[in-house]
């Protein structure tokens, strides 16, 4: 299987997001990279499901709560940005203050 660098990046995000999802399901608090991966993967999947950029920007703020992550993580993540593929091309999705 041949993958270009963008496809490899998306596969890595998905894999890290899946690990984070499983850890969250087991009741573990997510660390910084896990939280970013969890949010990023959900945004990519939301774009694939047909959500718009503005819908994703709101959706990204509903995924994790302060109780889901380790102490200090919400303050470390001021924003999450991911380049998602939409029917009309790739767009940058930015979620400000994703964990409240």
Curated annotation (Swiss-Prot):
It is found in: Cytoplasm. Keywords: Cytoplasm, Hydrolase. GO terms for biological process: urea catabolic process. It catalyses: urea + 2 H2O + H(+) = hydrogencarbonate + 2 NH4(+). The keyword Cytoplasm applies. Heterotrimer of UreA (gamma), UreB (beta) and UreC (alpha) subunits. Three heterotrimers associate to form the active enzyme. This is Urease subunit gamma. It comes from Acinetobacter baumannii (strain ATCC 17978 / DSM 105126 / CIP 53.77 / LMG 1025 / NCDC KC755 / 5377). The lineage of its organism: Bacteria, Pseudomonadati, Pseudomonadota, Gammaproteobacteria, Moraxellales.
């Amino acid at each position: 299987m041949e993958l270009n660098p963008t496809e490899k990046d998306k596969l890595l995000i998905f894999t890290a997001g899946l690990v984070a999802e499983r850890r969250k399901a087991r009741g573990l608090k997510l660390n910084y990279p896990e939280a970013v991966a969890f949010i990023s993967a959900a945004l990519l999947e939301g774009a694939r499901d047909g959500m718009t950029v503005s819908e994703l920007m709101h959706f990204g703020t509903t995924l994790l709560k302060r109780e889901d992550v380790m102490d200090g993580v919400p303050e470390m993540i001021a924003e999450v940005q991911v380049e998602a593929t939409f029917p009309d091309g790739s767009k940058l999705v930015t979620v400000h203050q994703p964990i409240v």
